[in-house]
Amino acid sequence: VVGVLDAGLGDTVTPEDRVFWLDEYRRNYKGDVGRERLRTASINLRDRDSLHARLGSVTCPVLWMHGTADAVYSVANAEDGIRRFSQSADAQLKIVDGGQHFLSASDPQHVNPATVEFINKWR
């Protein structure tokens, strides 16, 4: 879990935030239930391409935020993914310069206001 967390947070997260998220991940993936949760998350990441075929049937608004420093998925993956929401009422891709995979941890100053604005637009 620590390796995945480090890759997702990148090097821009403060030491205090890194400790917070590491503690949260350890708590979340603790014991048998936590290991099952981690296994399911890993399978979902591995098999995510099978989801692409279903994205064309999504009709709700979609906000996809992606960091340019994401070590897991590239901006090109995000650009391809957002195009697949062909029936969405509003499919937006916002790129965050220098943002990591765990964008809400590395760049809350971008994620939080964009999310609030998007939700307010569609509620």
Model regions and ranges:
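Acidic catalytic loop of the alpha/beta-hydrolase fold
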Residues: 69-73, 101-102
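Residue-level signal for the nucleotide or nucleotide-sugar donor/cofactor binding architecture
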Residues: 33, 73, 106
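Short beta-strand/loop motif that positions the catalytic acidic residue
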Residues: 58, 64-66, 70
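Short, conserved loop/helix-junction motifs that constitute active-site signature segments
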Residues: 55-59, 84-88
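Conserved alpha/beta-hydrolase catalytic His-Asp/Glu region
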Residues: 1-56
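Catalytic active-site module of serine/aspartate enzymes centered on a nucleophile-bearing elbow/loop
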Residues: 88-123
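Short alpha-helix in the alpha/beta-hydrolase fold that links the catalytic acid
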Residues: 60, 74-83
